[in-house]
Amino acid sequence: MTQHAPIFIVLLPLTASLLCMLFSRIKKELGPWIVMASIVGAFLSACTVLQRVIANGGKAWHYWMGGWQPPIGIEFALDPLNSVLAVLVTFISMMVALYSKPFVKEEDWLHVGGYYTLFGLLTVGLCGMIVTGDVFNLYVYLEIMSLSGYGLISLGGKKSMLAAFRYLLIGTIGASLYLLGVGYLYALTGTLNMADLAQRVVPFIGTPLFAIAVACFIIGFGIKMALFPLHGWQPDAYTFAHPGAAAFIAGCMSKAPAYALIRFMYYIFKVDSPVMHSALNVLGILGIAGILIGSIMAMAQYDFRRMLAYSSVAQIGYIAIGMAMGNMYGFIGAVLHIINHAFMKCSLFLVIGGVEHRFGEVNLYRLGGLNKKMTISTITVTLAALSMIGLPPTAGFFSKWYLMMGAYTGQQYFYIAVLVVSSLLNAIYFFRIIEQMFVQREASLTEVHPHKGKLGLPFSMALPIFVMGIGILVLGFYSVDIVTDIIKLGLPEVFLR
């Protein structure tokens, strides 16, 4: 069965999602457990793939649907980078699926089944985008990710329907631009397979049609990954999304498009042409603007979730400037920050959801005494905040370190200045949270769901928060191994010459 591990990453959660409503109708609790079991299976399949790819020295595992060879057949192409990202997405999905149970505990079977159906489909879309070797199938998975994301955001109540509708309008533009870019490439090359496309597109790299296609991909993926100034949908979407799913949406939903953009820029188009140099310069400018403006906007917020939404705009800027540097260290920093930020932001949103579940609000200035009421959550927030600032030995330090090395190697010293300023701004608004939790007088919060235990939350919520907090340290301690044994095995050809 291990020879089919690549397809199981997508097939298991897809099958469970399609059956979830039926099982939930039979017994309300059955549907969620079916979806969670399928995600565990997808996670184990992703681990199997990663282990085999590393054992083969980084050689990609090509899986052909039905035995049909590309470019005619549909292919999953798993290399060290997308294999580790598949492990990341399925692991976070597994944690958040368990975490979500108390939020839907009192709902009827229809709402419970609907929630976990959308959750499973979001996992399918994210994993499919990461592992597919076909540009049109990437569009299919992009739409699955987007549609399920719209649904999960709309379940949040209050202003969530408006936030989801705004994301729908803007996201549709992004998906349409991506599809338009695919059409241009197909017109030039006559193929949709990524590996075949990388060979056939070379003679057309200097043409106007190719430049238009590149612009379509940058804008299309830029919208999906909330790259400044294309991030307008994100603050409301993160703020008003269903609290159970917000951690998954914030942690992973912008990372799959970011990786897809890296894949196009470095593996299909290469980066050693005037057109691509111009594209990288644009990414760098947008990344710098996003880092500075996102950080400043985050400082002005009093709602914890909205602050983190603007913080994500800045963090996506880090990934953008890593891509824009055009050297090995910048590339490593960008990929490593995709992994690290997924853990950091997911951890913070898990805690926010826990605070909202227990107290019904997440005002930054009403967190006083939280260290006594929710100890595990407070520790996780502290670790995540230190990592976002970039202090060792947390994960965030190492991705910023590689970005600094990339800027130094490329003599792009203005990137170093931006990273330093951004870290100082991060320190201002994250230490504000730490001060509220540890120093300020205990806030008089009304407990919506009182919890008397030491964990401060139900076990199914406290466990993922604890695991994700530990994960931030583990990623920090093993960052050198991740870079050496995984990321460097999957470096694009341009860095191996």
Where are these regions (language model features)?
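Short helix-boundary/re-entrant hairpin motifs in multi-pass inner-membrane proteins
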Residues: 163, 215-282, 309-310
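Transmembrane helix-loop-helix hairpins at membrane boundaries of multipass inner-membrane proteins
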Residues: 1-7, 19-117, 195-199, 487-496
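C-terminal ends of transmembrane helices
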Residues: 17-27, 95-107, 150-159, 163, ...
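Cytoplasmic/organellar membrane-interface segments at the starts of transmembrane helices
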Residues: 241, 374-377, 432-497
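Structural signature of hydrophobic alpha-helical transmembrane segments
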Residues: 2-12, 80-91, 135-148, 210-223, ...
